[in-house]
Amino acid sequence: MLLTAPSSRGSRTQSGIANVSWWALSLLLLFSPTLVSAKSAADYYVRSLPGAPEGPLLKMHAGHIEVDAQNNGNLFFWHYQNRHIANRQRTVIWLNGGPGCSSMDGALMEIGPYRLKDNHTLEYNNGSWDEFANLLFVDQPVGTGFSYVSTNSYIHELDEMSAQFITFLEKWFQLFPEYEGDDIYIAGESYAGQHIPYIAKAIQERNNKIQNDQSVRWNLRGIVIGNGWISPAQQYPSYLTFAYEEGLVTEGSSLAKDLEVYQSVCESKISASPNAINIRDCEEILQQILARTKDTNRQCYNMYDVRLRDTYPSCGMNWPTDLVDVKPYLQRPDVVQALNINPEKKSGWEECSGAVSSTFNAANSLPSVQLLPELLESGIPILLFSGDKDLICNHVGTEQLINNMKWNGGTGFETSPGVWAPRHDWTFEGEPTGIYQYARNLTYVLFYNASHMVPYDLPRQSRDMLDRFMKVDIANIGGKPADSRIDGEKLPQTSVGGHPNSTAAEQQAKEKIKETEWKAYAKSGEAALIVVIIGVTVWGFFIWRSRRRNRGYQGVYQRDVGSGSILERFHNKRSGPADVEAGDFDESELDNLHSPGPEQEHYAVGDDSDEEGPNHHPAAPPSSTKPGGAQP
């Protein structure tokens, strides 16, 4: 907006009008800070993704949300909209472990819609979990992956983590209200077995505090934990038991006798501190197994998949092989820009943060296994699954925690005193895939020939498991279902396959989502317009009064601000049928309404020059790695 004063009546009038203009603009910005700094869903829209397959880009959003203003703590998310809708909207929140390992592992190597063919080419993942669920990947705690926080402001305890995650969800649903009514499932693996139950409990507590209709109760429908670090008291002693079962160590050998000494020390430490989540003396069992079973070429077992070998002392830290492509891809400047990474995130992406892992010791937190009975009894279904070739968070420990846990009037998988729920054989497309076991709201699935990262090895089978847990039945949708059977009995249809597809239910849901989006945009747009109109009115009044005083003065404004003005076009863009997020509007039209804040700019940060913590691949032996720690 430009004001000129071609009249020769003097500079006083020009100066006065300029002052009035600045005063009006200041008033406008004072009462409408959202025009300067607040973001909308459109700011998070991913308009392109380098290396994506040909064809329409999947609808996705990504970026940072502040969860700790005092320490500049921001969590990064990457969200994908589902490809099909069976009978209702569902959202799966995915978390990787560590603590301090990025959920981009899950996004690009496990359950996300894309996998990397090489370090610059994406291809579709036929087992992606986005078939019937929206996917929300979050790098957490602060400092993990693309998330960031001020130096030395990492968090330490599980309740701190869950509080920040609730803050994240509150703000995320404000940006994307169309998803707030979804059925919500929280899923993840490894050390996320500690995070997920705490987040679930925090959601329940948040829902219980709602006293009015201004807030929406979140529909938590279940939690899913794969190869989880849930009960250290059962998981630590399982290392040696698993090593015997898999033939890594021969029972009764001299090595076995030495390891049993470490086992005895560990068990005494557990007895002294039954609620400890990290016990260094117990970690020594795993380190000794890896060190003393290496061959003459210094090849040790891969702790995440004992079918594989790795160079000592890495012992699995170089796995999965996809990491060689994932890291350079996520450090590319064009990818960083496409994912709306804040310029405040100075260092490039790393899979795992040593600083976060070493700081998050949970010394004053109870192990999450103690939260599971109450969650089950409150009606939250829980699915625990394990790949049978994982050592570090092996299925033996998971089965022991189930056998010892009491909930809903029974112990373990008891169906009645002394009677246990049977194990059912599961086949997928004619191949033995694993076993299912269920009792009193808890489901356990053991996958055959699978590692610590089950969806990495068996993507379609893992999605079939998820769809059954979410009670998806696509019989009325169409498409080719998978042949999945329990004890030979064909199960409800859960897979249609292919990218992408459309259904009547999907179209209805899209219309509902679009309606909700426009309501949210209109609400924020109307508030902004009110302030703009007030400012323009005040400015116009002073111009009119100045003209009356100084008839020789003429205000020249090069563009009409009447009914065809930018303000009107802005309103039309907010309320019309166009897709705001997809970029159908001309963003330059907004330049006259707000000043771009620093978060509106995107810079490349894809280098390693200023890392927040140690690399995921340390030079030190694995003894520096926590069980369930520094891992996917």
From Swiss-Prot:
Residues 39-523 are lumenal. InterPro entries: AB_hydrolase_fold, Peptidase_S10, Ser_caboxypep_ser_AS. The active site is at S190, D390, H452. It is an enzyme of class 3 (hydrolase). Residues 545-632 are cytoplasmic. Glycans are attached at N119, N126, N441, N449, N501. Residues 492-506 have a biased composition (Polar residues). Protease with a carboxypeptidase B-like function involved in the C-terminal processing of the lysine and arginine residues from protein precursors. Promotes cell fusion and is involved in the programmed cell death. This is Pheromone-processing carboxypeptidase kex1. It comes from Neosartorya fischeri (strain ATCC 1020 / DSM 3700 / CBS 544.65 / FGSC A1164 / JCM 1740 / NRRL 181 / WB 181). The gene is kex1.
